Structures are given as C-alpha cells and as structure tokens.
Amino acid sequence: MHVRAPWSLPEPTLAYFPNARFVPSDRDLGAGALRLVGEDCPAPTRGGVAVADGPTEPGFNDFHHVPVLAQRCVELLRPALTRHHADGSEAVLVDATIGAGGHAERFLTELPGLRLIGLDRDPSALEIVRTRLARFTDRVTLVHTRYDGLASALTELGYGAAQSIDGALFDLGVSSMQLDQAERGFAYSKDAPLDMRMNPQSALSGADIINTYDEAALADILHRYGEERFARRIAARIIRRRADRPFTTTAELVALLYEAIPAAARRTGGHPAKRTFQALRIAVNDELGSLRSAVPAAMDALAVGGRIVVMAYQSLEDRIVKRVFADAVASRTPVDLPVELPGHGPRFRSLTHGAERADAAEVEHNPRSAPVRLRALQRLELEALPRQGTGKGES
C-alpha cells in the first residue's frame, strides 16, 4: 500500500444530528499494520457517531465501523467491477472519501481480485485505514489528497484521468473520528481551538475567518453554507465581540451564538451552533468547490460501463450532485427533433430513481444513515440508447 502527499490541501457536516451527543459507533477500526510511504500520519484516536442515545463509550478497539448503505453500494458497483472477471480482477475502484475504510474493506473482501485507490485529505484517516486494510496491502493504494485531486492522482499513478477506472465511490458524510478529536475544533459540543481544518497543513482556519472577515463576508458564509436565517445578526455580534478580543475557542463562539439567536428559535431546530459550525467548516475546507470539481472528474475517469455512487448527507451537497448527474443523463439533441443527433446523446444513465434513502432497518442498525441521499450513474457508449426525452428535470 502506498501513499503520497504531493501538495498541501486547503470537507461536510456536524449538523446531521444537531441535538446529539457522541458515542462510539461506526467510523473507526483498528487492524494490522501497513507502511504509508511519504506521509507521517498521527496515531488513530477513539471514534464515534452522533446519535440521540447510546451505550457507554468503549475503547477504540471495542467497536466496528459500520459503513452506510454498504450492501446497496456493492449491488450498484459490482456489475462494473466484475465486467472482466467475477472476482474483480483487472478492475479499479476509486474510494474518493476512504475515511476509516468500511466501504473499502467490504469491496476488497467480496472481490479478491479488485484493486482499490483510496483518497483522503486527512492524514489521521489514512493512518487508521492503512491499519484496517493491512491484509489487502498488495491491492490498495492510498493517496493523501482532497477528492478534487482525483484526476491528478490517477495520472500520477499511471492510470490516466480519462476512462481509466471501473468504479468510483463518494461517501460525503462527516467523519466521527474527526469530531471526536476535540483539538480539531469540529464539534460544538466540546471546547477546543477554533480550527476546523480537515487537513492540519492547510493555511485557513475557522479562527482566521471569524477574526478577519468583514461583516458582509461573514453573513454571506453563514447564509450560503449554513442556510442560517440569523446570519446577519450573528455576523454583527461577531464583529462587536472580536473588537474586544479575538475568538480562539469553539466555546467562545458557541456562547455568542446562544446569545445571538432568539430564544424562540433556540427551542426548535436543534443546537443554535449547528448551522454556523457547518458553514465555517465548509468555508475553511472549500468543501462545495471541491465537490463540484471532484464528481465530474470521477465521471470522466470512468470507462464505458463504469459506475459512480455518491452518498450525500446534507442538502447543499446533494443539490450539487443532483445537478451534475442531471446534466450527464440529459440529451444534447434539441427537443423538437425525433432522433438523437450523432454525438449528442446522454453520456450516462441513472441507476436510481432520484435519490435513494436508507430504510428503517438500516437507520436502526446505523443511525448515521438517517439523512443519506444516494445517487448512482453508469457510463454509456455514445448513442447507446434510443431517444427518450432530454432527461432534464429528474427529481
């Protein structure tokens, strides 16, 4: 297993379970040992997922990462990964958000010939996953990069950025192991430095934004990325407070948010800090910009017959995925023509009817799956399908 870190890295949200406390569950696992080439990754820490209630917190090795909708991901991607051989030989899967490696482990176990490339911007995640996937070392390559570095990673690994892989998987959900590392500043339930960087090597932190951006820019971030209806009110309070002293900790920001949001609003809609923390984290890590580049790059990298699955956990991400997918399945032929013009047919076909959701059994087994929206596409040969409308307006 290999890893590289060719560039510094400037991902989404704590707000999925706004009233929750954190209990160990489904994002981490310790296993054997692997060597990561070219990256000094910190040791793994305990993990957890936000749920409404749960058992007393055990140690890091006492629980198992439960990947969201793992069986459905396998069902959707297996046909593309077994086109050459039933065991996945000669197929390449890119796990663009490998995290603790739950999905990767499932695919590598079920398809003993599959090669997997795992991407993550967080060196802590790579340390955990390299340990978890130790027994698959000859079939796994880990790359320290944001997921919008996918094309560059494939090129540097010798695959090429176009039509070179058979499957791509994006699990955009928040990593509980990052939330559980209090010093990272992601969790509003814990006092910590106001950091929020997915990659500790990145330059911009949450404190930088809070302490240096002007009132209009702060309000725009809170409204655009947090969909916070009190964005202007909060921004004004931040400006007044930092004139006295700069913000340095999450607790200071949480206290201000509690005061800034009206009491009536605090009684509904979850924790008063959830939207602001989401917005700051998205801005610090350029999550949405990265996603807008990453999904099209993954689609371009798919060979004909290849498939992509994307799981989003909040509406801002899902809207981006929905728009990109809708464009990919749309015909470019004018709607008033009865036949498809050469080269104007859809490039992909949808494998899901809109966004799929986790069923009750999945949510009970894995609470983190409650907000998930899964979408999937398959790459087509040009002119592979007869004209059946434009494909626009899919829900």
Curated annotation (Swiss-Prot):
EC numbers on record: 2.1.1.199
Main location: cytoplasm
Catalyzed reactions: cytidine(1402) in 16S rRNA + S-adenosyl-L-methionine = N(4)-methylcytidine(1402) in 16S rRNA + S-adenosyl-L-homocysteine + H(+)
One of the record's GO cellular component terms: cytoplasm
Residues noted as binding S-adenosyl-L-methionine in the record, renumbered to the chain: G101, G102, H103, D120, Y147, D171, Q178
Protein location: Cytoplasm
Protein origin, superkingdom: Bacteria
InterPro entries attached to this UniProt entry: RsmH, SAM-dep_MeTrfase_MraW_recog, SAM-dependent_MTases_sf
Gene Ontology terms for molecular function: rRNA (cytosine-N4-)-methyltransferase activity
Keyword terms: Cytoplasm, Methyltransferase, rRNA processing, S-adenosyl-L-methionine, Transferase
A Gene Ontology biological process term: rRNA base methylation
Group of enzyme by EC: transferase
Similarity field: Belongs to the methyltransferase superfamily. RsmH family.
Function: Specifically methylates the N4 position of cytidine in position 1402 (C1402) of 16S rRNA.
Protein name: Ribosomal RNA small subunit methyltransferase H
Gene name in the database record: rsmH
